[in-house]
């Protein structure tokens, strides 16, 4: 509740209500009295998202939101980020190396190489680009090589 105490003029009751609402939104309503060490990695990620959205931000910044998670939990986190982005009408910026996440929730993709913008486009445009840095990074995965070939054959 620290951010609410610092930046919002709300009563204790209103703050508790807001925290409970946000915890319910990220499916952690029964975990509000647990210590961080008692939470799984996926639960800790959801707590981080809850802490970020409790203040109704205009922007949500996520740094490697799926790192250290199993594939199923990573998909749950991606879905949660997408739902919250849509529901709260906020701009979300995600820094990730996970191309599955990029393709699932990225509207606009900016590819950085050595800290410099190397390419910008949509998830569909990723499959069409000839940008060497993007092709090398994205298609290091056999799955994405197959997806690209299927996409290019489909658009002929």
Q: Each predicted region: which residue ranges?
A:
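Conserved ABC ATPase signature
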Residues: 35-39, 43
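C-terminal boundary and immediately downstream tail of ABC-type ATPase nucleotide-binding domains
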Residues: 124-156
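A short, proline-enriched helix->beta-strand linker immediately N-terminal to the Walker B motif
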Residues: 54-58
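Helix N-cap at the start of a conserved alpha-helix in ABC-type nucleotide-binding domains
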Residues: 71-73
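Catalytic Walker B motif of ABC-type/P-loop ATPase nucleotide-binding domains
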Residues: 60-63
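Conserved ABC ATPase "signature" region
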Residues: 12-30
